[in-house]
Amino acid sequence: MMPVILPLLLSLAIRGGDGQAIQGDRDLIAKLFKRYQEHGLSVKRACHTCDDGTECCDSRCSCPWNTCTCIPWGK
């Protein structure tokens, strides 16, 4: 078991030891996303329709008293 765990821990220490590699990955994703939008390419978003026909993208429905609104995730 120990020979399997040691290479995994070593790869994590090299990859994210100073946090720069992980931050660099986020920067790359942000650049690609921005380029996608600049060229007018659509970015697939999670959209669904609420009970009253309201369309919510990247959020959830809240329908008190049969009036639906979209609430961002995590709020």
UniProtKB/Swiss-Prot annotation:
GO terms assigned for molecular function: toxin activity
Q: How is it modified after translation?
A: Contains 4 disulfide bonds.
Which keywords does UniProt give here? Amidation, Cleavage on pair of basic residues, Disulfide bond, Secreted, Signal, Toxin
Gene Ontology annotations for the cellular component aspect, listed alphabetically = extracellular region
Q: What is its main location?
A: secreted
Q: In which tissues is it expressed?
A: Expressed by the venom duct.
Q: Which residues form the propeptide?
A: 20-43
Q: Which family does it belong to?
A: Belongs to the conotoxin V superfamily.
The domain comment in this protein's record states: The cysteine framework is XV (C-C-CC-C-C-C-C).
Q: What name has this protein been given in UniProt?
A: Conotoxin Vt15.1
Give the originating organism: Conus planorbis
